[in-house]
Amino acid sequence: MHFTRTLFNQVASKASRQLPVQKRVQMAYDLHIPNKTVNPNLNIRSHEPIVFVHGIFGSKKNYRFDCQKIANVTHTPVYTVDLRNHGQSIHALPFDYETLAQDVADFCEDHGLKKVNLIGYSLGAKICMLTMLQNPDLIRSGVIIDNSPIEQPHIEIFLQMFVKSMIHVLNSTKIEANDSDWKRKADDAMKRYIPDGGIRKYLLANLINKVPKGYKSPVIDYDDGFIHFQNPVKHMTEVAVKNVSAWPTEKVAGKTFEGPIRFIKGTKSAFIDDAGKKAIAGYFPNHSISEINATHFILNERPLEYVRVICDFIKTERFRSLQEHLRNVEHFSPSEIEAKQAAKHAQQIEELRKVTSTSESSIPHSTQSSEQAFTENIDLARQEREHQKSVSA
């Protein structure tokens, strides 16, 4: 009896705790390195990395296969992150767009990432848009999947249902961690609130019956013998609804991001409506929109299509950037411009060549792909052009 009361008191004490406030967190992440390119003679890996940010109650593991495909096709390292209160990242407040966007910017800074291509879905889409607006020099381009930079109070009822269904699984069923049928029982319990099997699968992907090695939560007792979500859902009933549907309009008033942005809209989704399109045009003048026949859950319903749109966009923008670099190099003539401009250009070229002179073996595995210099692409293109001229001659 004493043991039972002690255990109960420990569980109750932890459940009553509040999420700690932590301004800065180190997000858990996976790095997807591109395999050999389709052409064995072109072992090029861009130094403009991709960072993929998931949606509410998602995680870096949800789209690991998709992100590996993106890495392979674009020859680009892809970082997938776990936002705070998701996956293997820390459980902490605040949980608002300003804090989450700063988490992404801090992640890029901590890992030495520059000219980043951001990809964000749903909650992650808004986070990426805000990151671009607040850190334009850090971001090269972006792909925004089915969301708009506006307040969306109409989605709160769905967010409330998500939270309620997850808490119901924990409170009403009390499924033991060693129950061999725990996944089916959890799915059955969630049907009361979420009849759609695809959405249940998405939410239940966060459910675990044993804690990841070395992970601890300040508010969840993973060792109490029951199944748990990796998200502190009982402590997110407010922030996962009101804060997710919000948008910091006043904070970004007058701000724009001039880089290329591709929006992916689900034709059966209301997340990018007329008001959203108007806001998009105001914040992101250099944007385009692709439509995919899907609901808001595009990534689960049309994985091949959204991956194709992303890869085509990244490769197209890289080609345009390469052409611009080539024009700058070809038109460079020290005798025609001031000496100061010539010295500055030479310094930039030398810095790029220093990066490429570093051997792969001396670069840490987690960063070697993201530090490859863009001059490799320039040299390759020039060689190809010279070859074509010699053939035509």
Swiss-Prot record:
Protein task? Alcohol acetyltransferase that catalyzes the synthesis of ethyl acetate from ethanol and acetyl-CoA. Can also function as a thioesterase by hydrolyzing acetyl-CoA in the absence of ethanol, as well as esterase hydrolyzing ethyl acetate.
- What is the similarity comment for this entry? Belongs to the AB hydrolase superfamily.
Gene behind the chain? EAT1
| Compositionally biased tracts (Basic and acidic residues) | 343-354, 379-393
* GO molecular function terms noted in the UniProt entry: acetyl-CoA hydrolase activity; carboxylic ester hydrolase activity; transferase activity
User: AB hydrolase-1 domain spans which residues?
Assistant: 49-151
Where in the cell is the protein located? Answer: Mitochondrion
Could you tell me which PANTHER family the record lists for this protein?
A: PROTEIN ABHD11
Q: Which reaction does it catalyse?
A: ethanol + acetyl-CoA = ethyl acetate + CoA; acetyl-CoA + H2O = acetate + CoA + H(+); ethyl acetate + H2O = ethanol + acetate + H(+)
Q: InterPro entries from the entry?
A: AB_hydrolase_1 (IPR000073), AB_hydrolase_fold (IPR029058)
What this protein is called in its record is Ethanol acetyltransferase 1
Q: Which GO terms describe its cellular component?
A: mitochondrion
Q: Mind listing the UniProt keywords for this protein, alphabetically?
A: Hydrolase, Mitochondrion, Transferase, Transit peptide
Q: Which Pfam families match?
A: Abhydrolase_1
Matching Gene3D superfamilies: alpha/beta hydrolase
In residue numbers, the region (Disordered) covers 343-393
Q: Where is the active site?
A: S122 (charge relay system), D146 (charge relay system), H296 (charge relay system)
Tagged with keyword Transmembrane: no
Superkingdom of the source species: Eukaryota
Transit peptide feature range: 1-25
**Compositionally skewed regions (Polar residues) per UniProt:** 355-375
